Amino acid sequence: NGGADNYAGIQGKLWPTGNLIKNCESFDNCDAGRNDADGFAAKLTCGEGNRFYGCISHNNIDDGWDLYAKSVSGTIGSVTIENCVAYNNGWLTTDDVTAAGYNYGEGNGFKLGGGYLKGGHKLINCVSFGNHAKGITSNSCPDISITRCTAYNNGNANSYSIGLNTMDSMLKEWKVSGLISMSKADLTAKADLIPFSQHGDDN
């Protein structure tokens, strides 16, 4: 954690597979441009079967978790994130966010994709709160699974607390069960972006 020369706290590169990251905390990660340092990054060139369990990611300048993929490098392996917490991402513990002209980082809690590519990622029994942007976002991935998760008071950047989105022309294969989203009445966040097909008695 810490330091403007750092990128992600923990990042998988060169297609690692079958790793378990357990009971770790990642915070105060920041790159020189203040827009690309995540707490945990299983993105771009990450292989199959990697898992995060019991981890906490907070106060990273970019995202708590970033599972970004892009067409140049292709799809990444399926990632499971279970019993984890993401909060207060988008600024550092040492930042004075009240200073004139302060610029937040992107600040998503759980960013679960990118590039309109499939990932099959799973978010299970996780909590996301107080993040500058979205608490949970598919970030264009069309087939993530969200089970028994809670998002609270995210979206201080006039964003969604939860956002499931991809191209209109793509088949949406999201699976959502037991998802709770709450915000304080004075928060500027937009209404959650969740397709009607995912609404139900337990969401």
Spans of features found by a protein language model:
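Predominantly extracellular beta-rich ligand-binding scaffolds that present long acidic/polar faces
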Residues: 83, 116-203
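Small-residue (G/S/T/A) turn/hinge positions that recur once per unit in extracellular repeat modules
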Residues: 16, 46-47, 76, 142, ...
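Extended non-membrane alpha-helical scaffolds
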Residues: 74-78, 83-88, 100, 105, ...
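Extracellular beta-strand/beta-solenoid scaffold signature
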Residues: 1-14, 31-46, 59-73, 94-115, ...
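Short, solvent-exposed beta-strand-terminating loops
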Residues: 91
